[in-house]
Amino acid sequence: MGASDPEVAPWAPGGAAGMAGAGAGAGARGGAPAGVEARARDPPPAHRAHPRHPRPAAQPSARRMDGGPGAPGSGDNAPTTEALFVALGAGVTALSHPLLYVKLLIQVGHEPMPPTLGTNVLGRKVLYLPSFFTYAKYIVQVDGKIGLFRGLSPRLMSNALSTVTRGSMKKVFPPDEMEQVSNKDDMKTSLKKVVKETSYEMMMQCVSRMLAHPLHVISMRCMVQFVGREAKYSGVLSSIGKIFKEEGLLGFFVGLIPHLLGDVVFLWGCNLLAHFINAYLVDDSVSDTPGGLGNDQNPGSQFSQALAIRSYTKFVMGIAVSMLTYPFLLVGDLMAVNNCGLRAGLPPYSPVFKSWIHCWKYLSVQGQLFRGSSLLFRRVSSGSCFALE
């Protein structure tokens, strides 16, 4: 059996190159048998597979690299990594909660302070509503600093459940390995890759959204109790009992459809726009080495500037698309608190909506589909209708 035998090449140490090297070395030493030199380089018999039953070689498969059992730094540390993500997410959620709290109160139309007269960039007199900082100071005056964190507990639980759900889905349905496609000649392959990745992200986002939405509803209702100074929803367990008793199982999923639609539109819009911009407007020949010779003489710097531009493109597209999908977020949050027995979900703050489409049409007529999208410069529009106190 020669070194070039296809049955030996996959498992023999060194393969054909090792056997050829043995022959060359034997010839240099004056005719020593090549087989002796080859046997001297072979591993001990205890570690050598039978030639007719070769032992399968260890493959650096995607499962090991993705965090499967036995993966260095991933398989055994997966629970630790997931717990770290949950902890970091909880910290970010807690820090950003006052911002979202004020935003929700503005979304439901609660304006406890009257607008003030100011001038715009053209010098015209306009009415401005209080900014985020002024609104936050008002909440501190009424409820103290701890009042800025009303409804934080169910929101922390919602985000943690969403993170754990996404991590579990990645283990059960691991994503396929994708190759980096950046050439305009590979547009079909690249577009298929984007569609496949976006479909996978959409599946994870929709499932995690559905599982975490009941806690999101509880968090929203806990926060809007500030409007009427109610205490109907005080804890997670008691809130679950109240919602189930008054509204049934569907009460936990009010406002879910606009949130899901917003997530789907955001994912597809952001990924497809970023893909087409990167494919048609970003030049792969851009190099950061002098003279434009970096791609041949320094492969490590190949497409470095193009890759940097691509990374920023998706970020910018995310901001732009999130502005376009904001009405879905607004309608979903309003439906979560509408007609639930709280003052913020009843007239004069809001009519009782029959469906999320009814809510959308009402806000569109009032010119309020982007209410709460800006927290710094909030100008009173001509069609605004607020319940001022």
Swiss-Prot record:
Q: Which UniProt keywords apply?
A: Apoptosis, Membrane, Methylation, Mitochondrion, Mitochondrion outer membrane, Repeat, Transmembrane, Transmembrane helix, Transport
Q: Where is this region: Disordered?
A: 1-78
Stretches in topological domain Cytoplasmic: 105-155, 230-254, 343-371
What ranges does the record list as Gly residues composition bias? 15-33
Mind telling me which Gene3D superfamilies this protein's record contains?
A: Mitochondrial carrier domain
Q: Which residues form a coiled coil?
A: none
Q: Where in the cell is it found?
A: Mitochondrion outer membrane
SUPFAM superfamilies xref list: Mitochondrial carrier (SSF103506)
Entry membrane topology: Multi-pass membrane protein
Please state the protein's primary subcellular location: mitochondrion
For the modification Omega-N-methylarginine, which residues carry it? R29
Record bears the keyword Acyltransferase: no
A molecular function (GO) term: membrane insertase activity
Question: Which GO cellular component does the record give, naming just one?
Answer: mitochondrion
Residue windows of the Solcar repeats: 81-176, 192-280
GO biological process: what's one of them? protein insertion into mitochondrial outer membrane
> Where does the sequence pass through the membrane?
94-104, 156-176, 210-229, 255-279, 323-342, 372-389
Q: How does it assemble?
A: Interacts with PSEN1.
The UniProt family comment states: Belongs to the mitochondrial carrier (TC 2.A.29) family.
Q: What does this protein do?
A: Protein insertase that mediates insertion of transmembrane proteins into the mitochondrial outer membrane. Catalyzes insertion of proteins with alpha-helical transmembrane regions, such as signal-anchored, tail-anchored and multi-pass membrane proteins. Does not mediate insertion of beta-barrel transmembrane proteins. May play a role in apoptosis.
Q: Please state what the protein is called.
A: Mitochondrial carrier homolog 1
Record the organism: Mus musculus (Mouse)
- Primary gene name: Mtch1
